[in-house]
């Protein structure tokens, strides 16, 4: 028979095991765009995941998106602290956050979900006049844009290197305008481009510049 002491030793670690980190999940859906649906999950510890569902894209890498993507991501301390501060200031999204009305054009259905030991909540919206929700939406969309650009650059590197120059210029502009963030998530590809003498020097230089500017935490 198992003694009470043995049972206690088995149960105690379960009672005192650390709670999983809080998470924010952002879902975007728009049938007119590629990818037509994606989900970003960010943990308060910086871990995360990106999953997208879209069309096949063209073989030369010119179309907007490749097929579905599912990959881990990392979110820097500065960005994730901003994200979780917004969640806590807005009741963990357990509130109405859509202010679209009939006069606001459809911009995609967005869902924010918070799950953590301190609370939980969900809100669905097309557009929100809440500036904090707006900034959070921009952050998630900018991370997704970085991953999408990385996917396009990968396809172009494999199938159509002549278009790398113009695509890197687009990414560089997006980064400077804040429309693409968390560049470290495509760092392996940028390192490949920076070190490949077979691609244009402008591509190499831009890749190095983006790597130098990306956060390291």
Describe the residue ranges of each PLM region.
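N-terminal post-signal-peptidase region of extra-cytosolic proteins
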Residues: 35, 65-70, 91-98
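Acidic/histidine-rich, surface-exposed loop or edge segments in extracytoplasmic proteins
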Residues: 50-71, 170-172, 188-189
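Short, well-ordered, aromatic-rich surface patches in folded extracellular/luminal domains
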Residues: 19-32, 96-217
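Charged, amphipathic alpha-helical segments
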Residues: 77-101
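Bacterial N-terminal signal peptides that target proteins for export
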Residues: 1-8
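N-terminal targeting signals for Sec/Tat export/insertion, comprising classic cleavable signal peptides
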Residues: 30-56
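A short, structured loop/turn motif at beta-sheet edges
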Residues: 74-82, 114-120
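Bacterial N-terminal signal peptides
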Residues: 8-15
């Amino acid at each position: 028979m198992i003694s009470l002491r043995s049972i206690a030793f088995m149960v105690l670690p379960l009672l005192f095991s650390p709670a999983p980190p809080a998470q924010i999940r952002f879902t975007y859906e728009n049938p007119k765009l590629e990818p037509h649906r994606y989900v970003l999950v960010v943990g308060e510890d910086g871990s995360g995941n990106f999953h997208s569902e879209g069309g096949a894209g063209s073989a030369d890498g010119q179309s907007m998106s490749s097929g579905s993507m599912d990959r881990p991501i990392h979110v820097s301390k500065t960005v994730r602290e901003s994200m979780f501060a917004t969640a806590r200031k807005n009741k963990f999204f357990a509130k109405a956050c859509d202010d679209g009305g009939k006069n606001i054009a459809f911009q995609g259905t967005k869902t924010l979900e918070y799950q953590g030991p301190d609370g939980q909540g969900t809100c669905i919206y097309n557009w929100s006049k809440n500036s904090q929700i707006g900034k959070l939406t921009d952050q998630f969309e900018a991370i997704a844009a970085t991953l999408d650009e990385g996917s396009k650059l990968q396809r172009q590197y494999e199938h159509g290197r002549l278009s790398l120059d113009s695509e890197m210029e687009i990414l560089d502009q997006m980064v400077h305008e804040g429309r693409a963030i968390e560049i470290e998530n495509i760092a392996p590809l940028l390192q490949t481009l920076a070190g490949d003498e077979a691609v244009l020097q402008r591509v190499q230089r831009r890749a190095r510049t983006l790597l130098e500017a990306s956060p390291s935490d």
